[in-house]
Structures are given as C-alpha cells and as structure tokens.
Amino acid sequence: MKKLISLVLLTAMLATMLVGCTTLEGDEKGAIINVYIGSEITDYDPALAYTDDSAVKVLGLLYEGLTRINADGKVENALMKSYKIIENPDKDDYRMQITIKNTKWSDGRVVAADDVVYAWKRILDPEFTCSAAALLFDIKNARDVKNGDNSIDDLGVAAIDDTVIEVQFEKKIDYNLFLENLACLALVPLREDIVTRYEKEFGSFGQAVSTLCTNGPFAVKGLAFGKTLQLDRNVYYYRDTDNEDALDKYVIPYRLMINFAADEEENTTMYENGEIYYLGEIGLSKRAAYAEEATVTDLLSTHTYFCNTSKSVFKDVNTRLALSKALDRNEIAKIVTFAKPATGLIPGTVYDKSVGDSFRANGGDLISASADVAGAKSLASSGSFTLTIKDNAVENAIAEYCKGVWEGMGFKVTIKALSDADYREAYETGNYDMIAVDYQCLTTDSFAALAVFDPAFSGNGIDIQNENYDAVPYVVGYDNAEYNELIEQAFAETDRAARSTYLHQAEELLMKDMPVIPLIFNQDAYVYNSDVLSGIKDTYYGFRNFNKMKMKDWRDYQTTAAATTTAASE
C-alpha cells in the first residue's frame, strides 16, 4: 500500500514538473501576438542586411549566428557550443575548431557545419558583393579568394564533420576579436540547396520569402508585400523532438503578426487603441510624447548621406565639406527625437582598444554638431543634385531639413523618395547622386565599418572588365591611397590596442575627405503594453529577443488574433 501511495505521489510530482515546463495545454500552440517591429523590408538575405535598422530587427529574429552580443555588450555562445585553439608556431599553423550545438532548420533538417562553411564561401565569392567580406579576411587565402587569385577550394575553412568547423588563419590573430565578429548577422549559416534553388527559380535568394528556411527562433510562414508578415515559432529551434520537448520550451510565442499595410503613424495609433501590444518604431509625430515611456538604446548605426564621388557635383571635396558643415546636427537629432548628433562616422557603441572601450569617446569629435553656414559658403555655394531616400516620415523630415539648409546656400536639391525595393536597386547599382543610408557597423569592432572605404576591403570583388583587375571601390566610389595604407596597417596589426591608432587616423582622413556625411547616431526606441506582455529582452545589435515573451491571459486574445491572421491571408 505504501509503495502504491509513493508511486501515485511520484507520478503527480512528475506531472506537475512537466506542466511547469510549458505554457500550453493539450493541442494548444500558444499566443498569437500583434506587433510592429519596423518598416517593411523586401530583401531577407542576411548577407545584405546593412542599409537600414528594420532589416536587422527582422532578420535577427529569423537567423542565429555562432555567437551573439548580449545587451551588456558581452560575447556569448549562440549556435557555437565550444571552440578550441590549435597552434603550431614552427609551421606557422594557427587554427580554431568550432563545435556547433544540435538544432534544426525551420524545415526540420539539422543545422550542419557545412551550412556555416557555405555561407562564408558565398560571401567570399568574387562575384558576390558583401561588405562583411573583410570580417573573414583573417582566414587563410580569404583575400586571394575574394580577389580571384585563388580558388574557393583553397579557402582555409572546412567542415571536418557534421558539427565541427575548422578555421585556418593566415597568422596568429586576436581570437577573441574573431569570435566577437562572428556575431555579425551577415555571417549566419545558410543552406546551399535553398539558396541555389531560390536564385534559380526567383532570381534572388532574399526575395523568395514565403518559403524562406531559417535557423533562428522564428520562421516566415506568410508574407503579402505591403500588407502583412507572419512569423511563427520555429518548432525545431533546439527542441529535442525525439523526446517530445514541449513546443514552447525554447520559444514561447506561437505567432507574431506584423501589419505593413499601416505605416509607423498608423501602427502607433493601433498601439494606443490596444490593437497591437509591441511597437518597435514609434510614429514621428508621437515620439516626443513617448520620450519618457520608451525603452531607448544606442545602436551600432549612423544615419549618413553617401555622396557618389563619380558624379561631377561631388568630385570636389570642398562641395562635400560645405554640405556637411552647413548642417545643424543637433536640430536633426531634435527632429528625429530618438537620436544623437553625429560627431564622426563611428558611433559610441563601437569598441576601441578593448570590449566596452568606446571608439567614439576616444576619438573625440571629428565633425561639429552645430552648423557653420558662413564657413560652408566659403567652400562652395552652388550645384545641383538629387537626394535619394526611403519613403518614410523620418527620412523625409531629415531630407526636407537638409534641403532647406542647402538651398539657402545656393544649391538646388531634388528629393527622390523610393520604395524599399527601388531604393535597394539604386543603392546597389550606384544609381544616385546622394543617398540616405542607415550605415550599420557590422560588428562592435570599428575595422569593418572603416575598411570598406578601401577598395581592397570593400567586399565588391574585382573589376574583370579592367585589364589590371583592380578591386572595385565601395558604393561611394572613394579611393584614397593614404587611407588605403592606413587600413592595410590596421589589418596587419594583431594587437587591438595598437591597431586603434591606425583606425582613428583613417576615420579622421575620411571625415576630411567627406565622401560620406554622418548626420545622427541612431537610437532604438520601443514601447509595449506591460499589462499584456512580459519577458522581452534586448540585444546589443538593436533587435529584440522575443523567445521568452509571454502574453498574459493569451487565450482571451486568441479569437481576435486568429481573426487578424485569417483576414491577412485573404
């Protein structure tokens, strides 16, 4: 009898423990939550997510790299389970072996070491344009591969089994910095079979969104451009399906519904009316009212105007300097609300000599936050050009301010506001005079952000039409021998503190030549209904971690959310 009672009690305890591991009952899938993450994007290729903050916010939910940077700016393991260093100085042999965790793609296939290797080889393909290429140049033969001097098969990275990636380096490097850089969204794993098929069928991998296969906590399960985006829990994300792990063991929300039919202003009104519960982009007209309530963090990006130096109006450095000098960046930050006046290209969130050491604080102010119109007019006061922007309230407001200032000097400025797809085409083809870019620092290290202005590190490969097969400059067309030498010296220096000197000199020279005009350091600001949602976490890159987000009494909201989902799919 005592044994029977003990068995019953044990069974009851186990049942209680199992229930405590899940928020679901029976066949339930979980909460459907209406959110607004940011403005619509049209390219979901993580290797190209560096022209605006919204792309980072969305793709950060879909993909997971080997490491991550937490909200405190510290490197953490993500897909990477462990690593070990193998050194043989006598043979000049330096390697890192990275073991990845057991997880699956959103279609149920195991994430393999080969998926990481493929993604990196894709970035280093001479015919593929990607600014993140320089992050991989420490790998043996990487630069030669990107320049077309070596075969991709000569690249020093390989999958030695299903879970281990072996990286061979050109020399002894700062291994901690390499791991820090692996948090870059561009370096996440990709499936070769998926990318190849989509590029063949659709002409572009990143635009075949309705069937996108991802390894992060969420997966795209429905998309109607200009209308809605539906992100469902990736049911294979770290779950042990053989042992029947609870559906919500690693990702609690079942579905995130994003309304793109409404803009930031309309979504802000919907938030105020209780129709959505998380607002990741606050309407411009309401920002001042939310300044105290919003959670605000500094981003790894700078809103910048790129000057196409191949255009006659921008070939003269004095014109570029004049346009920069005339702007009151304090006023621009005031217009945007959630921003700081830019005093250089690199924002304060980027590290310098060590983790947590601010590059911007150490480098000081390279450009003034205040306007000097008289000084600007002494440099240049005439010219005509078109300013290309994305068609949204914030970029329009900034552009109208700049246009007013510049036309007051004597310039003629035309603003061209484009959809996301048309904007990307203009940016990638260089079909612009001046273009607004949320310039993303790909990592917490300043090297990658500065190196792209050296053609050898631009990620654009080589010009096969040129008899010298020269490296193709970055989209602004900037090419300065003195600047390029500073970047080469920084790349050759393995001591992070010593390398800092070259990088600061490079930024100073860039701001003297001004092929890019930094305006504001971007900030992220969001609000959510704390009576309904909890468990939202931040990341250093500015996207949210919704894995453990809970919706109070979510079953009461289920009918409304389900109706929204149904309407969106019709």
Segments from the language model and where they lie:
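N-terminal lobe/hinge region of extracytoplasmic solute-binding protein
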Residues: 36-88, 213
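Extracellular/periplasmic solute-recognition and catalytic clefts
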Residues: 37, 221-230, 257-311
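Periplasmic-binding protein-like
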Residues: 45, 290, 310-353, 397-398, ...
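Aromatic- and charge-enriched surface segment that lines or borders ligand/interaction sites
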Residues: 82-135, 166, 313-315
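Surface-exposed binding/hinge segments that line
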Residues: 131-196, 224
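Gly/Pro-rich hinge or "lid" segments in bacterial periplasmic/extracellular proteins
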Residues: 172-173, 180-255, 265
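Extracytoplasmic/peripheral linker and loop segments enriched in polar/acidic and small residues
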Residues: 336, 414-423, 450-529, 556-570
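Structural transition elements
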Residues: 337-379, 391-395
